[in-house]
A protein has these predicted regions:
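ABC transporter nucleotide-binding domain
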Residues: 214-315
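Conserved ABC ATPase signature
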Residues: 171-178
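Conserved catalytic motifs of ABC-family nucleotide-binding domains
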Residues: 192
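ABC-family P-loop ATPase nucleotide-binding domain
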Residues: 1-50, 355-358
């Protein structure tokens, strides 16, 4: 176990806390029944990052973390500071202030080390028309210093993972947009990085290509335990692949955390600290009659009906919701669905951001 650092007198851990390599973890009071859960170190940590262009604060005191196996959506409108932040993480720009760390290595003080453990896929990347797929990957493997069997193994690994093996001899300027994006991802993976930064990887792809690329990114996190930071304007796509997100606007992080945490904050912002929720109720028939009945019930507001489906706000908790459903059934309404509406990532984005541009 790591040696505990000295702490100030006014900043002591309580008796039921210990310090792991990353965070404080509370343990059971009974020493005979201690279950210690070690918290993973962040593989990507952004600390108070700033990038100014004259008076424009493109990145303004940005901080967030990401861990192994996470796919983090980096979300914001055009001009919010996403690409500038990503370029700093990729060591392509220096910050005005602050720092970021990839697997503990500073992008400011140790950029060479960072480049060896980070893969960056920009929104557009160069392709050389006189190369085929395998020659293109070979070029980047050599650029990372791979030689002999190590280089051949790296190329084969990428061809198999991206399912480009059958296109290995195909000229890259004849590839479809979807296959070109797979090649770009393969180039990013050639040195087997721990952290991946993907800037709009699904831009311009047809629906099938987007789904296939999404599946590949999911495999990187779930099976290979990579950390993935991904930006996109297609929020429905991010909502299906990401388990965490950081929302940025006008250079500032508005909220970051797991998707569930962000949805909870969105609900809190929209409704304060009440127990209200949006309910969805579907009946087999009698939808118009059900609508009139629901409007007469306590805690109900904002009722909307689409054929046999009702959506309405309910200003009370779980027990009154259960009672409402019970009374619906007692009234012989043929209810086949009754649930809280799940807010999408797009709902959260619209609720949290204010449409500010720089």
């Amino acid at each position: 176990m790591n040696e505990m650092p000295e702490r100030d007198a006014d900043d002591q851990y309580s008796d039921d806390e210990i310090l792991t390599g990353a965070d404080v973890v509370t343990i059971d009071d009974d020493p005979d029944d201690i279950e210690l859960k070690v918290v993973a170190e962040p593989t990507l940590e952004v600390r108070d990052l700033c990038r100014y262009f004259g008076r424009l604060k493109a990145v303004n005191h940005v901080s967030f973390r990401a861990y192994p196996g996470q796919v983090v959506g980096f979300i914001g409108p055009n001009g919010a500071g996403k690409t500038t932040t990503m370029r700093i993480l990729a060591t392509l720009e220096m910050p005005t202030a602050g720092d970021a760390f990839i697997c503990g290595h500073s992008v400011v003080d140790d950029p060479d080390k960072v480049r060896g453990i980070l893969g960056f896929m920009p929104d557009s990347f160069g392709k050389y028309s006189n190369m085929n797929v395998v020659e293109y990957l070979d070029f980047f493997a050599r650029a990372y210093g791979f030689r002999g069997d190590k280089r051949r193994d790296a190329i084969e690994r990428v061809l198999v993972f991206t399912e480009l093996r059958k296109l290995a001899e195909k000229p890259i300027d004849t590839l479809s947009k979807g296959m070109s994006q797979r090649l770009g991802l393969g180039r990013t993976l050639i040195h087997d990085p721990e952290v991946l930064i993907l800037d709009e990887p699904a831009a311009g792809l047809d629906p099938r290509a987007r789904v296939e690329l999404r599946e590949l990114i999911g495999l990187l996190a779930k099976e290979l335990n990579k950390t993935v930071l991904i930006s996109s304007h297609i929020l429905t796509e991010l909502g299906e692949i990401c388990n965490s997100a950081a929302i940025i606007e006008a250079g500032k992080i508005l909220v970051s955390g797991t998707i569930d945490e962000i949805r909870a904050r969105q609900r809190e912002k929209a409704r304060g600290k009440s127990t209200s929720s949006t309910l969805v109720c579907r009946a087999l028939s009698r939808g118009e009659e059900l609508e009139r009945w629901v409007l007469e019930q306590p805690f109900v507001s904002e009722v909307k009906r689409a054929d046999q489906i009702l959506t309405f706000d309910f200003e009370a908790g779980a027990e009154p919701q259960a009672d409402l459903l019970k009374r619906m059934i007692q009234e012989d309404f043929p209810i086949v669905e009754f649930q809280s509406k799940s807010e999408s990532l797009e709902d959260a984005f619209m609720a949290i951001t204010e449409g500010i541009t720089q």
